[in-house]
């Protein structure tokens, strides 16, 4: 198989990371999380640096910096980067982990309160419903009920809807979060809280899981049964190349820049035959296409291993597994 580019001179949608972003990613193994954070924040326009990172590489940076130390980076991130992070961090297979969901909402809220509230009332509304269904008990005071007594432990932001956290440790954050939502839009707040009782949790979570599956499939994360195909052995006949190799267009017009991760191939290509092969590639479009395809393979491996809260060591291991997997498939 050979690669070609239709228009090497024109701007292409798949590009290398921004200059500082590229430097940080190339030095990823040699920099500590604190140093990466300081370099980003020391830039004249740190938001531009973070927004230019592919979602997958952004996730790696968050894990390198640390979940509780990454708030400055979360503040600079795009909604798509937030969503990618949540899709990988708050799910246990096909179910949302309430504690993890609340923990990451707290981090986003602390990083950028106005943007988090705006996002939760729009793209993240389903997650907000699910978190509140799990975490809150709601009482409604009728307008003509003048003898209504506020039960102990309940609080209100409007004198009509009274809330209580089911988890005492989560109560301070849920009180602040619901207050921020009420302050942003009283109508949206009342609609949200009033609708909790009429929403079927299992149906909502099933819909959220379907949407998550679609989003992650764009990055190569496949359902478990499909992902298993990466371990299927290849016969010698499948590896034979007869005649002229096919030419593959790598101009990739219309491909979002954010879909081209840098780190998976960088981690896997530091040694061995793969490193030698990559060193001979000079066309940046070809290299970007290989990055994209390789990241998909690494994410396919991750789909088999499970996607629940992967840490940095696991990410590195999964990135280095596709070359070994390819070798073992051939040997079989």
Regions found by a protein language model. Give the residues of each.
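General marker for long, soluble alpha-helical cores
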Residues: 1-76, 80-332
